[in-house]
UniProtKB/Swiss-Prot annotation:
GO terms for cellular component: plasma membrane; proton-transporting ATP synthase complex. Keywords: ATP synthesis, Cell inner membrane, Cell membrane, CF(1), Hydrogen ion transport, Ion transport, Membrane, Transport. Produces ATP from ADP in the presence of a proton gradient across the membrane. This is ATP synthase epsilon chain. It comes from Xylella fastidiosa (strain 9a5c). Its main location: membrane. GO terms for molecular function: ATP binding; proton-transporting ATP synthase activity, rotational mechanism. HAMAP family: ATP_synth_epsil_bac. It is a peripheral membrane protein. It is found in: Cell inner membrane. SUPFAM superfamilies: Epsilon subunit of F1F0-ATP synthase C-terminal domain (SSF46604), Epsilon subunit of F1F0-ATP synthase N-terminal domain (SSF51344).
Length: 140
């Protein structure tokens, strides 16, 4: 079976390193499916999901807040602004962060950092979506 190495790295740490048969991510122009021997490319990633299908057929679900995807003949590298594996997301903390960001944006004052609050909201929504996908997968 043909594989491609996949690395997901954020500013804080390496999130994933391993062999994959398929990597799915959301680029600026839509969803990308990367398989072994894919043509080289570089694209910006939107906040959303990254799904890696491992050699044994397991699907690993990650939530990213955006970044860059680079494909070379033998490796896919995702440089994520932030990334987390769906099965490690703290749902209570994510809901709290989402509510806080929504509260800040609803009560805009002159002293708030709107871009930061919007980014916090996007990250929380992406993580909640990853949790929902994980729950649907586990139920089946």
């Amino acid at each position: 079976m043909s594989t491609i190495r996949c690395d997901i790295v954020s500013a804080e740490q390496e999130i994933f390193h391993g062999e994959a048969t398929l990597v799915v991510a959301t680029g600026e122009l839509g969803e990308l499916g990367i398989v072994p021997k894919h043509a080289p490319l570089i694209t910006r990633l939107k906040p959303g999901k990254v799904i890696i299908t491992t050699v044994n057929g397991e699907q690993l679900d990650f939530a990213i807040s955006g970044g860059i995807l680079e494909v070379q003949p033998q490796v896919v590298t995702i440089l994520a602004d932030s990334a987390i594996r769906a099965d490690t997301i703290d749902e209570v903390a994510v809901r709290k962060a989402k509510e806080e960001a929504e509260r800040i944006l609803a009560n805009r004052g002159e002293t708030i950092d709107v871009a930061k609050a919007q980014q916090q909201l996007v990250e929380a929504v992406v993580q909640m979506q990853a949790l929902e996908r994980l729950r649907r997968t586990v139920k089946h």
